[in-house]
A protein has these predicted regions:
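Bacterial N-terminal signal peptides
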Residues: 7-17
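Sec/Tat signal peptide C-region and signal peptidase I cleavage site
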Residues: 18-23
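Basic- and aromatic-lined ligand-binding clefts that recognize polyanionic substrates
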Residues: 46-50, 54-59, 166-222, 229
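A short, structured surface patch at a secondary-structure boundary
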Residues: 53-107
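Charged, glycine-enriched surface loops/patches
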Residues: 70, 127-165, 172, 258-287
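Extracytoplasmic ligand-binding site segments that recognize negatively charged/polar headgroups
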Residues: 73-79, 141-153, 189-211, 254-261, ...
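Structured C-terminal subdomain patch of bacterial secreted/periplasmic proteins
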Residues: 181, 245-320
Length: 320
């Protein structure tokens, strides 16, 4: 009997090793931006995302469609993924993505989707403690190096590094083309928008800001002083500090707001604001759709490269 057991021992050890290896293949450890070590599926199949612009759109660009996503509620009472229809062609109404709420996530809706991975951000109002009771939950900080960090994390989570490399290669080629046509190092640029009676200014305004920085444009000192990933609000009296050769003002386009409405809001902040800005007096105050400018997606980056290049390339002149 003992000889028989000894003879079977190698086979038992082999089987145990196989089971262990299979378990390791189906899950792995991942450290998120809160420093938490999370056991996640090696190949997640049912992902729920808690932010449309920062998480859902990048996932779609990487070729991964989540089963559920945070979204916004339109004036028609229908949910939508902000900027997604413009940038990816995908929205709730033409995909299998389920709407799981806007500001506060609908936990019951998430449970019903049977996710194997939940993606959130550190500042989302739905507590991670509640989410991780449903499925492994990873927090990705959108203020930590912006889009490059988000995409790197998502690609690692979903095994889509090759797709990310292609997207990034295309963007780098577009930046090189922009720099070849515009002497970016000699041009100062500024990006801001009116908000709640003040002027909102980011260190790097999402896709638009990243394009401007990657292309080598210069910024006013007040913008340089803002910590990376942060923003400030200033009073109208400091508006001249934001002057530059070119000013970009992203207007809210998803709600049907017009560029003129953005100008009216600036007038409300400071009547006759254009008189205080050299860029505005020289017809270099450019309004761009916020839906494209504020996204973290590569599609938005491409659109912003084209927009910046079209406004700044040399034009024919009638002056002698």
């Amino acid at each position: 009997m003992r000889k028989t057991l000894l003879a079977l021992l190698p086979a038992v050890v082999f089987l145990l090793g196989t089971v262990t290896a299979q378990a390791e293949e189906t899950s792995r450890s991942f450290t998120d931006d809160l420093g938490r070590s999370v056991s996640i599926p090696a190949k997640p199949k049912r992902i729920v995302t808690l932010h449309d612009i920062d998480l859902t759109i990048p996932l779609i660009e990487l070729g991964v469609t989540p089963v559920g996503s945070h979204g916004r509620m339109g004036t028609d009472g229908k949910p939508y993924l902000r900027s997604s229809a413009i940038l990816t062609g995908v929205d709730f109404d033409n995909s299998d993505i389920a709407y799981i709420g806007s500001i506060n996530a609908d936990l019951e809706a998430i449970v019903a989707l049977k996710p194997d991975l939940i993606l959130t951000e550190p500042d989302r109002p739905t507590p991670i403690e509640k989410l991780e009771q449903i499925a492994p939950t990873v927090a990705i900080d959108n203020t930590k190096d912006g889009a490059p960090h988000i995409y790197k994390m998502l690609a690692e989570l979903t095994g889509t590094e090759e797709r990310l490399a292609v997207l990034d290669r295309r963007y780098r080629a577009q930046i090189d083309a922009l720099k070849a046509s515009v002497d970016t190092g000699t041009i100062t640029v500024s990006v801001f928008q009116p908000l709640n009676g003040k002027i909102s200014v980011y260190h790097t305004y999402r896709a638009l800001g990243r394009v401007l920085r990657d292309a080598g444009f210069r910024f006013p000192a007040i913008i340089h002083a803002i910590p990376e990933g942060d923003r400030i609000e200033i009073s109208a009296e400091r508006l001249p500090e934001l002057d530059a050769d070119i000013i970009f003002d992203p207007y809210r386009s998803d709600t049907g707001t017009s560029p003129q409405a953005e100008i009216d809001m600036m007038e409300a902040v400071m009547p006759g604001f254009c008189d205080f800005l050299k860029a505005c007096r020289n017809d270099r105050y450019i309004l761009l759709p916020r839906e494209e400018a504020i996204s973290n997606s590569y599609a938005a980056l491409s659109l912003m490269v084209s927009a910046v290049q079209s406004h700044l390339t040399v034009r024919p002149s009638t002056e002698k």
